[in-house]
Amino acid sequence: MSSMQFSSVLPLEGKACVSPVRREGSACERLKIGDSSSIRHERASRRMCNGGARGPAATGAQCVLTSDASPADTLVLRTSFRRNYADPNEVAAVILGGGTGTQLFPLTSTRATPAVPIGGCYRLIDIPMSNCFNSGINKIFVMTQFNSASLNRHIHRTYLGGGINFTDGSVEVLAATQMPGEAAGWFRGTADAVRKFIWVLEDYYKHKSIEHILILSGDQLYRMDYMELVQKHVDDNADITLSCAPVGESRASEYGLVKFDSSGRVIQFSEKPKGDDLEAMKVDTSFLNFAIDDPAKYPYIASMGVYVFKRDVLLNLLKSRYAELHDFGSEILPRALHDHNVQAYVFTDYWEDIGTIRSFFDANMALCEQPPKFEFYDPKTPFFTSPRYLPPTKSDKCRIKEAIISHGCFLRECKIEHSIIGVRSRLNSGSELKNAMMMGADSYETEDEISRLMSEGKVPIGVGENTKISNCIIDMNARIGRDVVISNKEGVQEADRPEEGYYIRSGIVVIQKNATIKDGTVV
């Protein structure tokens, strides 16, 4: 008898499939089941396959009928392989609060990037935080640095106010600080931010069974089960696993690009390549046919800035091996792949990097499409944000098309098309918004306050009568007067007008937070 033959495998649902089976060796054991009836034999076989109450994952057994055996003969594969399932209790997440936020200025002039409002009532920090909770990960560190007051306030109200059950988990905000004897300076990169608080993490790990560190960014829009990423990390016995996404030609140079072999091991990493270096990072993405339409449009694989490290590997890289390097993407990862098992996890669902005013604006406008590419609402994986206890929005004789209207708004005889209206927004008679994002207000003004302001020739919070706005981002608490036109009709791409209350970035007008646009202004 030959040492290898093909036989019919009996999976749990009873359908046969072809599988190679080795007859000798410790990998399998041939068992005879006596002269039982066919029904009793099948039931016994299936019970053996199921491993009793524990299931096949616990026993590692698989039943097959060999081609030369009688129906009563059963071959049971008792494999030595047992899948090591990833445990979310062994994962700690580190969310990076970002740098100075120059790419999103002026939205970041008084707030950290993760605190920027998105989608009407959320903040960017809600994305990784909610993904963590929905993945079962409840040990979270948020590292903050610049303009962190509003971010800290939002985290406290949303995640530290008792609304979410952490059981044995926690959310800790780690603000940039300086240790005695340490050179002055802010975080010098993503890796340096983690390194500065390595002592906090080490102390935490002594009391918790943390095996894997998940590094996340606070400026992206996506929905992910992080435990699928961690599971691949465990299955591959990887030192580092990068979450990657296919990207097109137009934006490829904005990201760190990767190449990996047939086993998923990363063999090349190039941070924001240009010219010939960019061309060299092209890959055949036809293997993504099952997940995306026309993968040829996405000839690059980009790192999402989402990483999983083995705990000891991360500590060694930051403290010893690359103690002088400051950034994961541009410095540590390109070096680490040569002597560490660095694996790629390809993410094919919606993902948008909110790195510029243009990408931020486009991502918000895409939420208004029908059907949208991304939905905040999902009953199984909801996104959390600060509870505000606001009344429902009131509208009177309004025309609304493809719009997101947040709670607590007052809309009167206005027209809204393909726009997002944030909490506590007020739009008055004759006003029109098209392709606009209005972030709303932190508080209400009473009718008496509004009347007093108008009698004094001042502008109340909101959009005044007969004002027309398009292709615009209106930051919080903005006061826009009557008969204003904001459309950038001349097509200016870049402009700084802080004394007039606005900037222009990539052709998009951005009204500053707390700005006042006087009656009759044309932008």
UniProtKB/Swiss-Prot annotation:
Pathways per UniProt: Glycan biosynthesis; starch biosynthesis
GO biological process, one term: glycogen biosynthetic process
Cysteines joined through disulfide linkages: none
Tissue specificity: Starchy endosperm and roots.
Catalyzed reactions: alpha-D-glucose 1-phosphate + ATP + H(+) = ADP-alpha-D-glucose + diphosphate
EC number: 2.7.7.27
Compartment(s) where it occurs, according to its Swiss-Prot or TrEMBL record: Plastid, Chloroplast; Plastid, Amyloplast
GO molecular function: ATP binding; glucose-1-phosphate adenylyltransferase activity
Record GO cellular component, one term: chloroplast
Protein keywords: Allosteric enzyme, Amyloplast, ATP-binding, Chloroplast, Nucleotide-binding, Nucleotidyltransferase, Plastid, Starch biosynthesis, Transferase, Transit peptide
Free-text activity regulation comment from the record: Highly active without 3'phosphoglycerate, and is only slightly affected by the activator 3'phosphoglycerate and inhibitor orthophosphate.
Assembly behavior: Heterotetramer.
Function: This protein plays a role in synthesis of starch. It catalyzes the synthesis of the activated glycosyl donor, ADP-glucose from Glc-1-P and ATP.
PANTHER family tied to this protein: GLUCOSE-1-PHOSPHATE ADENYLYLTRANSFERASE LARGE SUBUNIT 1, CHLOROPLASTIC-RELATED, GLUCOSE-1-PHOSPHATE ADENYLYLTRANSFERASE-RELATED
Protein family (similarity comment): Belongs to the bacterial/plant glucose-1-phosphate adenylyltransferase family.
Name under which the protein is recorded: Glucose-1-phosphate adenylyltransferase large subunit 1, chloroplastic/amyloplastic
Source species taxonomy: Eukaryota, Viridiplantae, Streptophyta, Embryophyta, Tracheophyta
